[in-house]
From Swiss-Prot:
Keywords: Chlorophyll, Chloroplast, Chromophore, Light-harvesting polypeptide, Membrane, Photosynthesis, Photosystem II, Plastid, Thylakoid, Transit peptide, Transmembrane, Transmembrane helix. The chain crosses the membrane at residues 73-94, 114-133, 174-196. PANTHER family: CHLOROPHYLL A/B BINDING PROTEIN (PTHR21649). It holds the Pfam family Chloroa_b-bind. Belongs to the fucoxanthin chlorophyll protein family. The LHC complex of chromophytic algae is composed of fucoxanthin, chlorophyll A and C bound non-covalently by fucoxanthin chlorophyll proteins (FCPs). The ratio of the pigments in LHC; fucoxanthin: chlorophyll C: chlorophyll A; (0.6-1): (0.1-0.3): (1). Residues 1-31 form a transit peptide. This is Fucoxanthin-chlorophyll a-c binding protein D, chloroplastic. It is found in: Plastid, Chloroplast thylakoid membrane.
Length: 197
């Protein structure tokens, strides 16, 4: 009882103690990115590790590029994961021993795929990184714009505000997909069914 009384007295006294002034430098440097794409409610600009606390725009753009790329890959991964979990598989065999695609499990696929198949996957990823998923023509209007003057799908018909809104939607969906694919992998490791039976 004495301990509870003493603790409440200390807490009460602490309420009236002068507050320590917060450093203003981090707030001032982060204000440079408050209006950037992705600084959206409810969090606003969120940089808990202080990766861009120095206000370096080039570093911010590089991190944004990486975030967009990982978000896009994660969105594809979630869809692919759910499609194969629903039982949709490629026909045929994966190797000469007769192992079918249907026999290969989701996460354990890396253990089941032959070494030659993994080399092909890595080569394909390298081709994408070096020749497809980048601004090859210098025509990019924003970070992550990989149209390269060839693909439009009506993007240029939108006004600037709509384009910004759609880019923000893509960024948020990518963030959610990154969490989603991680959750799907955890569920599989726990042995939890991903789809309703």
């Amino acid at each position: 009882m004495k301990t509870a009384v003493i603790a409440s007295l200390i807490a009460g006294a602490a309420a009236f103690a002068p507050a320590k002034n917060a450093a203003r430098t981090s707030v001032a440097t982060n204000m440079a990115f408050e209006d950037e794409l992705g600084a959206q409610p409810p969090l606003g600009f969120f940089d808990p590790l202080g990766l861009v606390a120095d206000g370096d725009q080039e570093k911010f753009d590089r991190l944004r590029y990486v975030e967009i790329k990982h978000g896009r890959i994660s969105m594809l991964a979630v869809v692919g994961y759910l499609v194969q979990e629903a039982g949709v598989r490629l026909p045929g065999t994966i190797d000469y021993s007769g192992k079918t695609f249907a026999e290969i499990p989701s996460l354990a696929a890396f253990k089941e795929i032959p070494a030659g198949g993994l080399v092909q996957l890595l080569f394909f990823i390298g081709v994408l990184e070096s020749s497809v998923m980048r601004d090859l023509t210098g025509e990019a209007e924003f970070v992550g714009d990989f149209r390269n003057g060839a693909i439009d799908f009506g993007w240029d018909t939108f006004d600037e505000e709509t384009q910004f809104k759609k880019r923000a939607i893509e960024l948020n969906q990518g963030r959610a997909a990154q969490m989603g694919i991680l959750a799907l992998m955890v569920h599989e490791q726990l042995g939890v069914s991903l789809l309703p039976q």
